[in-house]
Amino acid sequence: MIQDTIRKVVSMQDLAPDEARDLMTSIADGKVTDAQIGSILTALSMKGVTAHEITAFAHVLRDRAVQLKTDTSGTFVDTCGTGGDGAHTFNISTAAALVAAAAGVRVVKHGNRGVSSRSGSADVLEALGIPITLTPEEAAASVSSHNIAFLFAPGYHPAIGRVASARREIGFFSVFNILGPLLNPAGASARLIGVGDTRHIPSITGALANLGVSHAMVVHGDGTDEITITGETEVYELSGGTICRYTLTPEEFGIRRVSRETIAGGSPAENAEIIMDIFSGRKGPCRDIVLLNAAAAIYLGEKATCIYDGYRIAREVVDSGQAYRLVMALRRTT
């Protein structure tokens, strides 16, 4: 009974894997009311979710997702964040994904419109003139021709649509913010995932390992779900089943620390303008933070031996105009 599960979570008890699986199955199959979903999400947020719970939830939702099959093998990278950090930065991970793709990394970016922010990845890509509602066949073709495709979450995860109303009504960070970055329909084997709350880093990293992701960096930078230039970034790197924890600083890359206001964003149109200014050669903090996050994606995509080498490559890609030309090419696919 769903009421028994709610009572267990409310009493701060962790769910066994089979209990978590049954709960998400009931939600995905539409057997749970919005009121019950709201209760579950609230209770899970208060208790905190474990790696095993996240893994079980993700398995259920991935089994129901529209899958993307490509005609190429090898490493695919996704760059995304949990959101909910309240930092109001521009769409850094989206810009970083474009730079990584221009560097030759195959990127399958999975995302949505903004929920807790003014501009989600889908919103800014739309403002850039890049198509966001690709069919699986169109997405596979885009990866083959341009190294990148955007997978609009509602088109690939119909089961998640069943919780949309309840999520809007409760209006706070929930387990679905955590699940989103784990549900890439292409099964991307490498992930750069930003986490807005450090409490979730260990459980997300553990879930990635349980889900078979071979290489990932789970990052939190000075209160944001990005690798930051405003302070230190905490990193959990998963590689070959082993998790290594370390910190990164802007100074390691020759970048001067700045205030968060210098990397603030706005509307989708404003964020698109920031990105195109960067790709057109404008220097400054916004460019620096995009290069730093792109460096991680390039490293994860096996186009660099380390993140420092990835930073050099990202800088060359932007300075040479390759990232700008990629946006122009993607616009022509509409």
Curated annotation (Swiss-Prot):
Record-listed Mg(2+) 2 binding positions: D225, E226
Keyword Metal-binding: yes
Co-factor requirement: Mg(2+)
SUBUNIT field: Homodimer.
Lineage summary: Archaea, Methanobacteriati, Methanobacteriota, Stenosarchaea group, Methanomicrobia
Species whose genome carries this gene: Methanospirillum hungatei JF-1 (strain ATCC 27890 / DSM 864 / NBRC 100397 / JF-1)
Domain of life: Archaea
SUPFAM superfamilies noted in UniProt: Nucleoside phosphorylase/phosphoribosyltransferase catalytic domain (SSF52418), Nucleoside phosphorylase/phosphoribosyltransferase N-terminal domain (SSF47648)
Entry's Gene Ontology cellular component terms: cytosol
Catalytic reaction annotation: N-(5-phospho-beta-D-ribosyl)anthranilate + diphosphate = 5-phospho-alpha-D-ribose 1-diphosphate + anthranilate
Protein residues bound to 5-phospho-alpha-D-ribose 1-diphosphate: 81, 84-85, 89, 91-94, 109-117, 121
Biological process terms in GO annotation: L-tryptophan biosynthetic process
Pfam families: Glycos_trans_3N, Glycos_transf_3
HAMAP family named among the record's database cross-references: TrpD (MF_00211)
Gene name of the record: trpD
Residues at which anthranilate 2 binds: R167
Single GO MF annotation: anthranilate phosphoribosyltransferase activity
Key words, A-Z: Amino-acid biosynthesis, Aromatic amino acid biosynthesis, Glycosyltransferase, Magnesium, Metal-binding, Transferase, Tryptophan biosynthesis
Summary of the function given for this chain in its UniProt record: Catalyzes the transfer of the phosphoribosyl group of 5-phosphorylribose-1-pyrophosphate (PRPP) to anthranilate to yield N-(5'-phosphoribosyl)-anthranilate (PRA).
Pathway: Amino-acid biosynthesis; L-tryptophan biosynthesis; L-tryptophan from chorismate: step 2/5
PANTHER family per the UniProt record, alphabetical: ANTHRANILATE PHOSPHORIBOSYLTRANSFERASE
Chain residues that bind anthranilate 1: G81, N112
InterPro entries found in the cross-reference section: Anthranilate_Pribosyl_Tfrase (IPR005940), Glycosyl_Trfase_fam3 (IPR000312), Glycosyl_Trfase_fam3_N_dom (IPR017459), Glycosyl_Trfase_fam3_N_dom_sf (IPR036320), Nuc_phospho_transferase (IPR035902)
Cofactor notes: Binds 2 magnesium ions per monomer.
Entry protein name: Anthranilate phosphoribosyltransferase
Entry's EC annotation: 2.4.2.18
List of residues binding Mg(2+) 1: S93, E226
